[in-house]
Swiss-Prot record:
Gene name of the record: MAPKAP1
Pfam families for the chain: CRIM, SIN1, SIN1_PH
Documented activity regulation: Phosphatidylinositol 3,4,5-trisphosphate (PI(3,4,5)P3) promotes MTOR activation by relieving MAPKAP1/SIN1-mediated inhibition of MTOR that takes place in absence of PI(3,4,5)P3.
Ranges for region Interaction with NBN: 2-267
Free-text comment on this protein's domains from its UniProt entry: The CRIM domain forms a ubiquitin-like fold with a characteristic acidic loop, which recognizes and binds AGC protein kinase family members substrates.
Keywords from the UniProt entry: Cell membrane, Cytoplasm, Cytoplasmic vesicle, Endoplasmic reticulum, Endosome, Golgi apparatus, Lysosome, Membrane, Mitochondrion, Mitochondrion outer membrane, Nucleus, Phosphoprotein
PTM annotation (Phosphothreonine): residues: 86, 398
Name of the protein this chain belongs to: Target of rapamycin complex 2 subunit MAPKAP1
Annotated ranges, domain SIN1-type PH: 382-487
Gene Ontology molecular function, alphabetical: enzyme-substrate adaptor activity; phosphatidylinositol-3,4,5-trisphosphate binding; phosphatidylinositol-4,5-bisphosphate binding
Disulfide bonding pattern of the chain: none
Bilayer topology: Peripheral membrane protein
Amino acid sequence: MGFLDNPTIILAHIRQSHVTSDDTGMCEVVLIDHDVDLEKIHPPSMPGDSGSEIQGSNGETQGYVYAQSVDITSSWDFGIRRRSNTAQRLERLRKERQNQIKCKNIQWKERNSKQSAQELKSLFEKKSLKEKPPNSGKQSILSVRLEQCPLQLNNPFNEYSKFDGKGHVGTTATKKIDVYLPLHSSQDRLLPMTVVTMASARVQDLIGLICWQYTSEGREPKLNDNVSAYCLHIAEDDGEVDTDFPPLDSNEPIHKFGFSTLALVEKYSSPGLTSKESLFVRINAAHGFSLIQVDNTKVTMKEILLKAVKRRKGSQKISGPQYRLEKQRQPNVAVDLESTLESQSAWEFCLVRENSSRADGVFEEDSQIDIATVQDMLSSHHYKSFKVSMIHRLRFTTELQLGISGDKVEIDPVTSQKASTKFWIKQKPISIDSDLLCACDLAEEKSPSHAIFKLTYLSNHDYKHLYFESDAATVNEIVLKVNYILESRASTARADYFAQKQRKLNRRTSFSFQKEKKSGQQ
């Protein structure tokens, strides 16, 4: 241990010791502010004055040279140590080594042995450019694929394939829908067909895409070439079609509807379509007749009898007297219920109660009906839509679409972009079953361009009346069509409505008769 009292030696020793050991540079900052050597060479002119500059003989300001280590510099980057030459050399060697790995050195050697012309010719052999005869025995993969998929070329719905979204999932907005096909065979109709469509497609485009995929997969039976022959209905998860709601509007975009399960249903009333042939059997009974619709002529007469009795009694339980069927031209001869309709060679029968006969007055109606009237009655069960306006008591009329078929009457409001529903109540769609219809009467006919009719139906044990207006021709067609449907369906609601109406009429007649009697006695 040595004791030193010379600040110059101590300062130099500390500077040299901290050149390689002080990474922070704080010692340099502390020691550079108090330089002993500089104070000895240039003592301050006044006490407490430690000037850092002196005036030269020529009057110029000269900077002092600090007596410090060469590694210590007075600059703003005093805390950063520069890399040594050794580190830079090692870094350069490392980069050269990496570059050598990427490069491959090939040593060029002169060819000593001379090769013959034959050997040189074999190295670069000349190829023959003659056209080869086509090999008819082997087909290309494209030809094989085209033969395996002939329906792709003859698919009448190819124009709708552009709405297929299977190749755009993740890049464009698409919608995945499970479509049930009630028109399919009994085994495959239980399984839905998954369709991925573009979100910008309309309902009509989606129907075309379904038909295109259906045809491409080779499903049976074949579809109609006209897309307008089909419509989309809301369906349950098990494939059951929800008939309480009307079909989706074909002009609306598909992203407007949030249904993930739909059903493709064929509509038979579109113009220009080959509709399925409807078979009707006429059952004459006391005070009227009924038209029973059948699918084919293979149906048994027992099924026709059950339908006729059920329609005659309505929603009541089939109990009480038993009935039998007789041919219209063969009275008192019962029809074999186990036989088919095809074996009977007749389309008109009589419903007769057991232990009775037509001679007893059970059936006395044998009127002839005009052929045109029968055709109108048969066509009345086909679906047809009309544009009418509903009349309200406390608000303006509402434009809607009235769809009439043999099973139900659908009332769908027509949404208009100009009409604002901000201050008015929006009309809800209504679906009325044909068994709940009671009457359809012409209320008023002012001119050929304006007429009003009233539709009466049963709702929650109460009779409701709806009033519609349109031109006279449309109103008369609607009234005639609905009345034909009501005549062919002997519903309980209609019978109860007329019975209640008759009771009210009798009470009014009795009240007026008693009033006249009292006035006559006075």
